[in-house]
């Protein structure tokens, strides 16, 4: 699995050129574009590889216009957190609440992974969210992400990540500078503070999990890649 992370300014610049730079086999999929702007999956843009297939056809795949049935790379956005721990927590809570509202526009909701309290929270927000146009929910999410763009604070967060990763907090110096790093047969740009970033997200990332947990979570035995 590979992801790309941008600062807000970088992402806005990227969007201006991406359509003309991508080959015909790839496409930028905006999160507000599914089902005529009426279907929610998440708040994450992604680049899909159109000559691939990951799942059999289904109502769920059709609901998302078949766009989620391809290999993709997630595009995450770093935004500024407000100064002060309490203000930062309020920002994260607002994102979680907006995400809950948007869940009312998903194809289906799986409550099995939630505790009773979270089932009530998610179910209530999703029910309320059905009454709000999805376009308005996306506007609220972006407004929250941008509300602290003039903050003097040094902390950043992934504003379009799923709620259980909103805790990830990065220092400005870790992620606003980049270095070139060798990776297999190529060279990639990575955050200057790559080590503290990895530790913030994964903890001791050099230690393997127990053998029974060494199972990929982002893979499928059904992946097909087409030559033509």
Report each predicted region and the residues it spans.
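A short secondary-structure junction signal
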Residues: 85-91
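"Short basic amphipathic alpha-helical interaction patches in structured regions
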Residues: 17-18, 90
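The conserved acidic donor/metal-binding loop of glycosyltransferases
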Residues: 1-3
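A contiguous, mid-domain pocket- or channel-lining segment that forms the substrate-recognition surface
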Residues: 94-98
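Conserved catalytic core of two-metal-ion nucleotidyltransferases
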Residues: 8, 12, 18-82, 103-112, ...
């Amino acid at each position: 699995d590979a992801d790309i992370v941008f600062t807000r300014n970088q992402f806005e610049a990227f969007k201006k050129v991406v359509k003309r730079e991508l080959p015909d086999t790839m496409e930028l999929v905006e999160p507000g574009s599914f089902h005529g702007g009426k279907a929610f999956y998440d708040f994450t843009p992604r680049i899909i590889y159109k000559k691939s297939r990951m799942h059999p056809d289904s109502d769920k795949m059709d609901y998302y216009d078949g766009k989620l049935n391809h290999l993709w790379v997630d595009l995450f956005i770093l935004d500024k957190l407000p100064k002060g721990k309490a203000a930062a927590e309020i920002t994260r809570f607002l994102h979680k609440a907006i995400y809950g509202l948007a869940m009312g526009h998903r194809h289906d909701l799986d409550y099995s992974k939630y505790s009773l309290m979270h089932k009530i929270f998610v179910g209530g927000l999703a029910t309320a969210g059905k009454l709000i146009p999805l376009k308005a929910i996306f506007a609220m999410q972006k407004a929250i992400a941008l509300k602290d763009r003039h903050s003097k604070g040094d902390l950043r967060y992934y504003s379009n990540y799923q709620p259980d990763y909103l805790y990830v907090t990065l220092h400005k110096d870790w992620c606003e500078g980049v270095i070139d790093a060798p990776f297999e047969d190529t060279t990639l740009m990575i955050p200057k503070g790559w080590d503290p970033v990895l530790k913030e997200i994964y903890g001791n990332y050099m230690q393997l999990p127990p053998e029974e947990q060494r199972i990929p979570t982002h893979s499928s035995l059904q992946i097909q890649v087409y030559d033509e």
